[in-house]
């Protein structure tokens, strides 16, 4: 049984420190635009499966990244599926906001976050950070539950801002994803 939120505790590093990545890995990990749009372009049928959407405590690292004093945030965990095959596990951390304009990011159901945020011209993004998740990482419990082969995985994360509202998005490419 998987406990949410799935831990993505790892040695997140700036992309420049990953010199051993293949061209396919670089293409997918450093995609500056919507990963959702890129996945849609590579598949006949794209869908989102919500695994969990609930409020959780922020870690000290997450609070620091978000630059907030709040201790909780909405955590949304989804699978991005291409042709009914899970290819990306995504996790977003959305602090509560007093600004009603940002409520569109809460209660999205199976709508892809990328379809919403990349339509906003005020969206900004920090540099992408990369992490490796070895076969002993707790993320492998999800991989096993999905009946996918265990292998070292690559993930990326970025801090996004819409006006003054900051939120964190982490994406891990599952076994069989296009970048492997």
Curated annotation (Swiss-Prot):
Identification of the protein by name: Probable chorismate pyruvate-lyase
Keywords for this protein: Cytoplasm, Lyase, Pyruvate, Ubiquinone biosynthesis
Broad EC category: lyase
Catalytic activities: chorismate = 4-hydroxybenzoate + pyruvate
Family stated for the protein in its record: Belongs to the UbiC family.
Species this protein is from: Pseudoalteromonas translucida (strain TAC 125)
UniProt gene name: ubiC
Xref: Gene3D superfamilies: Chorismate lyase-like (3.40.1410.10)
CC annotations in GO: cytosol
Pfam family, one: Chor_lyase
Location relative to the cell: Cytoplasm
Superkingdom per UniProt: Bacteria
Pathway where it operates: Cofactor biosynthesis; ubiquinone biosynthesis
EC id: 4.1.3.40
